Regions:
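C-terminal boundary of histidine-terminating zinc-finger modules
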Residues: 91-106
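Conserved catalytic-core segment of NTP-binding enzymes
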Residues: 1-78, 87
Length: 125
């Protein structure tokens, strides 16, 4: 689904087992993820997890981890910032096909299985 709250407010979350909120290390993005997580909880989605995207350095990592702790959000993974993906996106190609060994694609592949599984996910500190 596309980013935003409108999908949840339309009732599309009725049969959702796990909601993944993706946030970037920017205040507005983190606040949006917090709002998504809160709405998901209100709608009865019990398993809400957070994945950090476009993480550049330890400052980004720390800011995201601190925000998630402060708002009781379960941070379960991160995808590093990867300049290759901007080039791939401009070409309209799929990152997994056009840049299969890139750091971001490798991180996404590592997260895909656990995110799709019914098993509980380990929270990152």
């Amino acid at each position: 689904m596309e980013a935003g709250l409108e999908h949840l407010s339309r009732g599309t979350g009725k049969h959702v087992a796990r909601l993944v909120a993706v946030l970037e290390p920017y205040y507005r993005s983190m606040e949006t993820a917090r709002n998504v997580a809160a709405l998901a909880n209100e709608l009865g989605i019990a398993d809400v997890v957070v994945v950090a995207n476009k993480v550049r350095d330890n400052a980004d990592r720390s800011a995201i981890a601190e925000f998630c702790r402060a708002h009781e959000m379960r941070l379960v993974g991160e995808v590093p910032y990867d300049g290759q993906l901007a080039d791939v996106e401009r070409r309209g190609a799929a990152p997994i096909d056009a840049a299969p060994g890139s750091p971001a694609v490798v991180a996404i592949e590592a997260l895909a299985g656990p995110l799709a599984s019914d098993a509980p996910m380990q929270v990152r500190e």
